[in-house]
Amino acid sequence: MKSHRFVPTVAPLTLALLGLATFHASAARPHRQYVPDTAHSISTSWGLVQQPTLPTQVCATLKAALMPVGGSLDTLDQNPAHSKRDTARLQAAIDDCPASSAVHLVPGDAGESGLLTGPLTIKSGVTLWIDRGVTLFGSRNPLDYDNGLGTCGTATSDKTKSCKPLIHVTDTAKSAIVGAGKIDGRGGSTLTAGPNAGTASWWDLAYLNVTKGLSQHVPRLLQIDDSTDFTLYDITLENSANFHVTTDNVVGLTAWGIKILAPSLVYSRPGYHCPAGSTPDVNPHATCFTPETAKNTDGFDPGQSKNVLLTYSYIATGDDGVAIKAHASSKRSIASENMLFTYNQFYYTHGFSLGSETDSGMRHIAVRGLSIDGFNSNDVHTDPYSANGLRIKSDGTRGGQVYDISFENICMRGVARPLVFDANYANAAVRSKLPSFSGITLTNVHSLGSKAFGGGELSFYGYRDAKTTLPIGISLDNVVLEGGKVSFAKRHFGGPASNPGATHFTFKGGPVSFFDQLTESASNDVQLQGKPGPGVQLQCNDAFIAYHSVLPDSPI
């Protein structure tokens, strides 16, 4: 069988970001021999990563049998007995597939494009290949996902997780999900079974955390655990009920050319202009959603993992675009390290985040060539931590060492809080795991400002309590925030007396637009080393591209 090498069209955004980048050899120190990035290879600290290719060996080809209406299967699975009609044949094909082969999902003979499934498990060495035009839809029957606790599809005061993910990858090596098709979690579709059948969607349940303080029990889209060398390539992940991609103890993850979106046009309107009274903040059974009301739909969340690459990808969700976690459990403590994020575009998100769980350590993480278009969105009334650009967050209950973190060649616009470095993210009476941020570097960062928020609000807020001060160590070189003077977040949760506080700044010679608003303070442990100088701000004219030009069912 001949090799299928699909080379996606490189969008103007990625070409622009590739062109403006000042290349470094790797995401982590010590550097490997310098090898320049190209459109088909990325240099990392763990080696040169080549653009993935489509499989050459196919063990089974499965044809889609369902015809979606307007991108939805809701008219076809109203009966909960029909909620997972393709699960058995999909799982059987995966289980019977030998390593180094793929299960290939293709359109039906009459143009059918949909498959409907409950939870699936990917076998070690096996690739799930979803062809262009094909969508794998997740069930909207909570009983299909329940892990035995009986509360999947509800919102309760108990935070114990009760739903299996739609796709689970565990104890695998060299497995993958590839192809130009889609996986749709159907977060905005009305549930068909359980106590909320006919009255709420997954996202309606998630919004009860805002209105009633309850914990939603809903499935993640893709969970990858205890695995090595997993690949996501060219796939679109949409409308997850919760996080789209999460990992735990993964060594080697390449995500290349993926697109993540929540909500899509199936659950919204162009420009996210929902009709009055249709969203879950005012209607408990919503008919339209915005990013602000599709809660906890994080895009890409690598946790306790290393050798992670996300490149040439697009993310618009109702929460963090990327959220890196590093949390020690009772069984093990695994750092998040050696991660590289290059040539990516964010839209509506809560930004690029590290934390708040940092207690098992984070190190050697680089973000390069990132564009963030915040659309002047600010969900401050229901989530004061939304609308960020670059963020590192932790607190005294889940903190650890965070060091060697670099942000380079970053363009932003319409972002309320462009820079947030906060070691006092939450309050707690007992503080036994203290956060320490050091070796943080910002180089060539340019925010074009916001019509709604001007220059935006910043936080440089290191850890301080009655006994301990752990200052942030951060260097700035050519960091320009337009839109007028910036403001600084108010002091909070018993941290330093003012913001900036407990922060040691180093200026590397390039311009820093807010330098004149910084003042040294011995009592507040603010130090300024060096001075900014003249320089040319990073050119961001070509750094933003409409998402619908890349993914047609995007509302923006």
Kindly give the residue locations of the regions a language model identified.
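Right-handed parallel beta-helix
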Residues: 132-133, 173-182, 228-238, 251-265, ...
